[in-house]
């Protein structure tokens, strides 16, 4: 399982990563957690290898999470999308 954490705030990415890692460990599940500071960086990585799920911050500088989701859906309809905000 590959999970993307996309947020322009490093502290928010770190917090979500910790929470996800804790929940995965509690369930005995393994996943590759990757962090991205922009929608553009996430989409570039997704072209190389698809993600199982992506947590997208709605309000990011530049490309928003909603814009990244729309772009992703043009090529990948299977990735689970979860929208976040602070």
Regions found by a protein language model. Name each.
Residues 47-51, 71-78:
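Conserved phosphotransfer cores of two-component systems
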Residues 78-86:
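A short, hydrophobic beta-strand element within the central beta-sheet of small alpha/beta folds
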Residues 60:
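Receiver (REC) domain active-site loop signature in two-component systems and cognate sites
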Residues 38, 64-67:
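Acidic catalytic/metal-coordinating carboxylates
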Residues 9-34:
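Two-component/phosphorelay signaling modules centered on CheY-like receiver
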Residues 35-53:
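Acidic, metal-coordinating helix/loop segments flanking the phosphotransfer/catalytic sites
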Residues 56-57:
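Active-site T/S-Asp motif of two-component receiver
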């Amino acid at each position: 399982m590959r999970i993307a954490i996309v947020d322009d705030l490093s502290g928010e990415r770190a917090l979500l990563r910790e929470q996800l890692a804790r929940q995965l460990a509690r369930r005995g599940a393994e996943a590759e957690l990757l962090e991205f500071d922009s929608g553009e960086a996430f989409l570039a990585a997704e072209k190389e290898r698809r993600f199982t799920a992506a947590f997208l911050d709605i309000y990011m500088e530049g490309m928003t999470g909603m814009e990244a989701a729309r772009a992703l859906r043009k090529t990948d309809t299977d990735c689970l999308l979860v929208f976040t905000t602070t």
